[in-house]
Amino acid sequence: MNHIFKHIPVMKKELIDSLKIKKNGIYIDSTFGTGGHSNEILKKLGQSGRLYSIDRDPIAFSIGSKIKDSRFHIINENFSKLLDFAKNEKIIGKVNGIIFDLGVSSIQIDDYRRGFSFKNDGPLDMRMNPNYGISASEWLFESNVKEISFVLKNFGEERFSRKIAYAIKRRSQIKKITSTLELANIIKKTIPTKNKFKHPARRSFQAIRIYINQELEEIHKALESTLKILKPGGRISIISFHSLEDRLVKKFMIKNSTKAIIPYGMPITEEQLNRLTTCKLKIINRILPTQNEINNNPRARSSVLRIAEIQE
């Protein structure tokens, strides 16, 4: 697949600086993408430092495989498998920093053939790894109104979820929806457009993409695994791009940085007992993009960088 990807990493300096990189440290880039963050980390590592990168997208893996550096290793896997990977590499409790740059990557959104864009026509796929799972086209064809409406409402916060779901199923009864613009136009004709700068299909496309790739479940598993992988003083830095992601990250950090409050006389769970005595995380910072960065890179507009550290 010959395609040139023009990717500007969001808050790159802030993300890299947040790690406080040690020259001989061990780091994990959980979302390699086109390698912008990984390459910056490698520049700061000494000869005995190590960087492990992960990406489920086969094209991202192909890009990463071209990096010939003995300090670098990349695997083609979901980041929810971080713990298994760390066990295999024998780096549990030894990692100095882990980064996540969540959401869809430029590899996916900029290539119409991947089926993520509601602006350019392509096959309605949306799988981050096209070799696994069901495509968006197949899922919409096989699902009923209730199932589609649930996904649009819960993963896209779409007010008109049921109306859109009915329109999709009406078209599906005539023929399967197979292209991105076909779906985008169905949605555009179904709901009112108040903001000319925001496409009416954006929430629905986000919702379907999140569901098809099980993104929120993947994030939850990956975040929990970082608590075992990082060493004391190790940092986790996460960039999210929409409220569902950021809510999940914020909840994870708050839950693991505050002690449990147990009402007197109530039974206590093992998790609550652990939280009574220890707080695993210390929240370091929350950073938003500057207006200058937003002007130069509109994709930065909704981004949030959250940083936390494993307690010493």
Swiss-Prot record:
EC number(s) from the headed UniProt entry: 2.1.1.199
GO cellular component term of the entry, any: cytoplasm
Residues where S-adenosyl-L-methionine binds: G35, G36, H37, D55, F85, D101, Q108
As for subcellular location, the record says: Cytoplasm
Q: Name one GO molecular function term.
A: rRNA (cytosine-N4-)-methyltransferase activity
Gene3D superfamilies, from UniProt?
A: Putative methyltransferase TM0872, insert domain, Vaccinia Virus protein VP39
Instruction: Provide the GO biological process annotations.
Output: rRNA base methylation
Using the UniProt record, give the first listed, main subcellular location.
Answer: cytoplasm
Q: What class of enzyme is it?
A: transferase
Against InterPro entries, the record matches this protein to: RsmH, SAM-dep_MeTrfase_MraW_recog, SAM-dependent_MTases_sf
Which NCBIfam families does its entry note? Answer: 16S rRNA (cytosine(1402)-N(4))-methyltransferase RsmH (TIGR00006)
UniProt lists the family membership as follows: Belongs to the methyltransferase superfamily. RsmH family.
Describe the function of this protein. Specifically methylates the N4 position of cytidine in position 1402 (C1402) of 16S rRNA.
Name of the protein this chain belongs to: Ribosomal RNA small subunit methyltransferase H
Q: Which organism is it from?
A: Buchnera aphidicola subsp. Acyrthosiphon pisum (strain Tuc7)
